[in-house]
Regions:
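His/Asp/Glu-rich metal-coordinating catalytic cores
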Residues: 1-36, 41-202
């Protein structure tokens, strides 16, 4: 699940990117049946081109996630068997199945993944934000989260930026109304806004 990269610290002169150690995967490449992507941020898909040079496996992700990945593969001249999935879709292999569930995040097409194995369910949330009024209009499927929880989960792998902070993250709707207000108040001035390129809604 996911294969991201990060950027070097000041203590790493001459290094452009930092990718995971995939030695185990290379040594066990016949066991790798698929690559599942939760969303299209660099820290989750950035190392996929390096992985696919070593591992021959289909890559599953949402339409936008695969679109972002496709550009990276083209840049690095790497071929990939990319397979689009949708919310609620299940991918089955001989040994396990993977159900994809929509979650809200700062990039569209984000998914959680419920892996059903012979020993139990492993639930990977991916990055998420509980937003009851998302810009795209599609709320996180918390009902499905509850159903899977009631079925029984062997292991929960949960991630969320700023999870250690108290309180709630504001809805994207609040950001939109704030931006509109700033545009109205500064109609005669130049406005420069920095944001992540992958945050299509903003």
């Amino acid at each position: 699940i996911d294969a991201g990269l990060t950027f070097p610290t000041d203590e790493m002169p001459g290094i452009d990117t930092v990718i995971p150690d995939i030695t185990y995967l290379k040594e066990n490449r016949e066991k790798v049946k698929a690559v599942f992507l939760t969303h299209g941020h660099e820290d989750h898909i950035g190392a996929v081109p390096y992985l696919l040079r070593q591992i021959d496996a289909p890559v599953y992700g949402s339409k936008l996630t695969l679109g972002l990945l496709s550009n990276k593969l083209t840049e690095r001249r790497v071929e990939g068997d990319l397979r689009e999935i949708r919310d609620g879709q299940t991918v089955r292999t001989k040994y396990f199945s993977a159900e994809f569930i929509h979650v809200c995040h700062s990039v569209a097409g984000s998914m959680a993944i419920a892996l059903r194995t012979p020993v139990g369910t492993i639930f990977h949330t991916g990055d998420f934000k509980i937003d009851y009024t998302p810009i795209g209009g599609e709320s996180m499927n918390l009902n499905r989260f509850a159903e899977i929880g009631n079925e029984g989960v062997l292991l929960l792998l949960a991630e969320s930026t700023n999870v250690e902070r108290q309180g709630y993250t504001m809805s994207e709707v609040v950001v939109t109304s704030t931006l509109r207000k700033l545009f109205v108040e500064n109609a005669d001035r130049r406005i420069i806004i920095a944001t992540f390129a992958s945050n299509v809604d903003r």
